[in-house]
Amino acid sequence: MKNKKWISLAAAIVLAVTALPMTAFAAKKDGEEKLAKVTLNEVAHSIFYAPQYVAIEEGYFKEEGLDLTLVTGFGADKTMTAVISGEAEIGFMGAEASVYAYQEGATDPVVNFAQLTQRAGNFLVAREEMPDFKWEDLRDKKVLGGRKGGMPEMVFEYILRKNGLDPQKDLMIDQSIDFGSTAAAFSGDTSSDFTVEFEPSATALEKEGAGYVVASLGVDSGYVPYTSYSAKTSYMEKKMSIWQKI
């Protein structure tokens, strides 16, 4: 009688242990089906944002229950437009973009809720090597800058003023070229003396022999809330369980 009880108990244990992997698999599959779909529009695709790409590749967002689609906007103005229009739930751009949208009377303000970078990630590139470069060397020179009012341009002008240069009087800053085209313009047209570039464009210019990195804007500007995640107020109110996982 005792032997029969032990046999029954052993059989029950075996069945329970065997069922565990299947239960776990079913739970995992069920969890995968319930991932919340989120479109994230980033201002640029650069090694500067490596932590974000690592999180995506390592599955950290999926672990948080998010099915993330990454789209590159190529400029804060375009990323902001994507968020306001609903093409993207989350925007990743300079904090200044949400301020501008608010000042323009946005009925559903876009709010910054998390910061990824705390320094500028771009570099000043010259046509020639300048091992003893000083910001004063930009006086009376032409520089390919960024969009007026954008974080890259504002930080650049802050550094100029910090070093005794008036951005409007002491040099010429060309702001007519699209964000993603300045490196090509610098390489193809030698009328400018310097350009401000993110990676990988800065390194590409060096490899091409068309330019040389002479200064880091991140080092010379200091700490600044350079790039942040943001979303519309209505989305943040309705989808708190989602954006808090970003």
List where the protein language model places each region:
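Short, glycine-/small- and polar/acidic-enriched structural segments
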Residues: 28-178, 185, 193-200, 210-217, ...
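Short, low-complexity disordered leader/linker segments with a strong preference
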Residues: 1-37
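Short helix- or helix-capping micro-motifs
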Residues: 205
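Residue-level recognition of alpha-helix termini/interfacial anchor residues
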Residues: 3, 138-141, 238-239
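Extended ligand-binding regions for polar small-molecule ligands
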Residues: 15, 58-62, 226-246
